[in-house]
From Swiss-Prot:
Its EC number is 3.2.2.23, 4.2.99.18. It catalyses: Hydrolysis of DNA containing ring-opened 7-methylguanine residues, releasing 2,6-diamino-4-hydroxy-5-(N-methyl)formamidopyrimidine; 2'-deoxyribonucleotide-(2'-deoxyribose 5'-phosphate)-2'-deoxyribonucleotide-DNA = a 3'-end 2'-deoxyribonucleotide-(2,3-dehydro-2,3-deoxyribose 5'-phosphate)-DNA + a 5'-end 5'-phospho-2'-deoxyribonucleoside-DNA + H(+). It comes from the Bacteria. It comes from Cereibacter sphaeroides (strain KD131 / KCTC 12085) (Rhodobacter sphaeroides). Gene3D superfamilies: 1.10.8.50, MutM-like, N-terminal. Keywords: DNA damage, DNA repair, DNA-binding, Glycosidase, Hydrolase, Lyase, Metal-binding, Multifunctional enzyme, Zinc, Zinc-finger. The active site is at 2 (schiff-base intermediate with dna), 3 (proton donor), 58 (proton donor), 273 (proton donor). A zinc finger (FPG-type) spans 247-283. DNA binds at residues 100, 119, 162. This is Formamidopyrimidine-DNA glycosylase.
């Protein structure tokens, strides 16, 4: 599933084609994805101007001129793709099979925005902009890891006394929004913390030290366009390339990259997810 860097990369890719532009025509090609689409969604989107595109955790919100926001979740395989007749500045050829094009937005200026989702685990909804944060998918989320509310004091307080593994704590969207399996593995490796270590056992310094590392990993991944392991593509159909710089994720059996370490990357399963770690570096 796309994590924060992938969703932020998609948002940035959509912005030139959508922000400030009118939705000249919307088409909805099926009744549902993961959940049913809102009633008359195509009719309600047509004629609306996109005021801005923003991201909350792993969700994209397009704020519209009529006072509603289009809430978008990519799910496991969803793609928001920019294409159009005017190839050039930000319009591209459509890189995915059209049979999975479930929602199409024809934008003022000639761009076409397509929500393509082969596995149909994605979702779209229309919500009142002023009440968007109260939407059931958003209301439970913790602070953004790249925002000012997420700092060392906050994280130390949330981890104190917790008897869950530190990896599970960082994946808990109520504690911090947008982190997923890939980036938590990478963060814990850089921090030298074993994924199975209890969150409450971390010293205050260790807890506070996670915050700059989380930001570091996320910003590096955004700069690289995210990680393409299976379905994820940027808005122009291109692959992300942060996967080429993984230090631990997916490297089971390979030597640890830490200079002077003789360890080999191992893999354990936690709550059904693979955790990659160096048993020598991470304690």
């Amino acid at each position: 599933m796309p994590e924060l860097p992938e969703v932020e990369t998609v948002r940035r890719g959509l912005e030139p084609a959508m922000a400030g532009r009118l939705i000249a025509e919307a088409r909805v090609n099926r009744a549902d994805l993961r959940w049913p689409f809102p009633p008359r969604m195509a009719e309600r989107l047509t004629g609306q101007r996109v005021l801005r595109l923003r991201r909350r955790s792993k969700y994209i919100l397009a704020d519209l001129s009529g006072g509603q926001s289009l809430l978008i979740h990519l799910g496991m395989s969803g793609r928001m793709l920019v294409s159009g007749a005017q190839l050039g500045e930000f319009f591209h050829d459509h890189p995915a099979p059209s049979r999975h094009d479930h929602v199409v937005l024809e934008m003022e200026g000639g761009a076409r925005i397509t929500f393509n989702d082969a596995r149909r685990f994605g979702a779209m909804d229309l919500v009142a902009t002023e009440a968007a944060e109260a939407h059931p998918l958003l209301a439970v989320l913790g602070p953004e890891p790249l925002g000012n509310a997420f700092d060392g004091a906050y994280l130390a307080a949330r981890l104190e006394g917790r008897r869950t593994p530190i990896k599970a704590a960082l994946l808990d969207q109520r504690i911090v929004a947008g982190l997923g399996n890939i980036y938590v593995c990478e963060v814990l490796f850089r921090a030298g913390l074993a994924p199975g270590r209890l969150a409450g056992s971390l010293s205050r310094a260790e807890s506070e030290g996670l915050v700059p590392l989380i930001r570091e990993v996320l910003l590096e991944a955004i700069e690289a366009g995210g990680s393409s392991l299976r379905d994820y593509r940027q808005a122009d159909g291109e692959l992300g390339y942060f996967q080429h710089t993984f230090r631990v994720y997916g490297r089971e059996g390979l030597p640890c990259v830490t200079p002077g370490c003789s360890g080999t990357v191992g893999r354990i399963v936690q709550s059904g997810r693979s955790s990659f770690h160096c048993p020598l570096c991470q304690r």
